[in-house]
C-alpha cells in the first residue's frame, strides 16, 4: 500500500467513526454483534487546542460475548488525554518547525493553557488560576516515537505506483550519537522530482554492503531498480563497488563540487612550484594569472555541454605547460564527469544531493538527541515522509528558474497528495 493510500485509508476510518449513528455505536467492537446496551458512563478530561474539556464517555455491554467497550471518538485516540489535534501540532512543530522537544512542549503548553510564553505574546499580564496544560517534553517524545514506528511500518511499497525518472542522487551523513557512538544515514533521491526514498542507517559507507542496503530499502519501498540509469554521488568507493557488483548498468555521475575540492589543492601546488623563483608582487601576479588559466581550462571540461567538447577541453588542458598532471587526473574520470550531458541521462544532476542534509540537520538536530540507531532512523523516516508531502516555497525571480516552486515531490512525480498530509499517512 502506497503512502498516499495509507493516508486516505486513515482519513476514511476517521470519517466512519465520526459519522456513526447511535445504532452503529451499539455494534460490539469485540465480536461485531449489534444490539449492545448502554452500560453507564465515566468522566474523561481531554485537552484540545482550545483547552481541557471535561466529558463523559459512554460505555456499552454486549449481550452475546459479555464484554464491555467504550464509545470511540475520532478526534482523540483511545486512552489518550490529549486530542489528535494537539499531537499533530506537536509532531509537526518538531519535524517541520525545526525545534527541540522541550521547546515544542513549551510552545504548545503556552498556546493551549494561555500560560508561560503566552503572556509575552499578548503583551499583558493575564491572571490565571492554576495551570491549565501540563504537557511535558517526554510526552511529545513518546508521540514522536510512535509516529516513527508508523513510518517504519509504511516502508513496504511506500512509493509503489509513483513515477520515477531513473536519474538518482545519493549521499550519506555521519552523526555522533549519545554514548560516543557513530553512524551514517544514507539517502536516495530522484534528481528530477526530488522524491526521497526511505533512508537507512548503517555503520559506515566504505563497503559495498552498506550501499546495497540502501538500494534494497528503495526496492522495498517500490522502486524498480531496473529503471535506474544514473546515480550522482561524491565518488564514494563503497558505492562504486556496489554499482559494479550489483548494478552494472547504472552510471555513476561524479559530483562536480567534490571534484573541485580535489582539484583545488593540485592546482595550488602546481602554481606555487612554478612561481617559487619569484617574489613580491611579481609572484602574486604570476600566481593569479596561472590560477586563472588552469581553472579556466578545468571549467571548460567540467562545464562542457557535450562529450566531444569535453574531450577537446581535456586536450587543451594537457597541452598547457602545467596542465599534464591535471589532465592525467581527469582523463579516467571524464565519462563520470560528463554522464549528465548525454541524451540518455536527461535530468541527472551534476552535483550530489548534499543540500538535503542541511534541511535534515535543521529539523531533527542531526542525531544529538538520539541515543541509538533505531531512534535516529525513525527520525530520518519521519523527515523523508514530511519532505515528500511538503510543497517547496513558491519563488519567482527573473534570473533563476525553480523547478519545484510551490510543488511537493509527490506532485512533481505526478501523484499530487491534495489535502492529504504526512500526518495522515502516519496515522497521528
Could you tell me what each predicted segment is?
Residues 2-8, 17, 224-232, 239-376, ...:
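Extended amphipathic alpha-helical interaction segments
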Residues 3-16, 38-50:
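Short Cys/His-rich Zn2+-coordinating modules
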Residues 14-25, 50-56:
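Short, flexible, mixed-charge glycine/proline-rich loop motifs
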Residues 26-29, 60:
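Cys/His-enriched microdomains
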Residues 29-33, 64:
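Short, cysteine/histidine-rich loop/knuckle motifs that typically chelate Zn2+
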Residues 37-95:
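Basic, short loop/linker segments at the boundary and entry of helix-turn-helix/winged-helix-like folds
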Residues 61, 113-232, 237, 241-249:
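RNase H-like nuclease fold core
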Residues 362-428:
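Basic, amphipathic alpha-helical segments enriched in Lys/Arg and hydrophobic/aromatic residues
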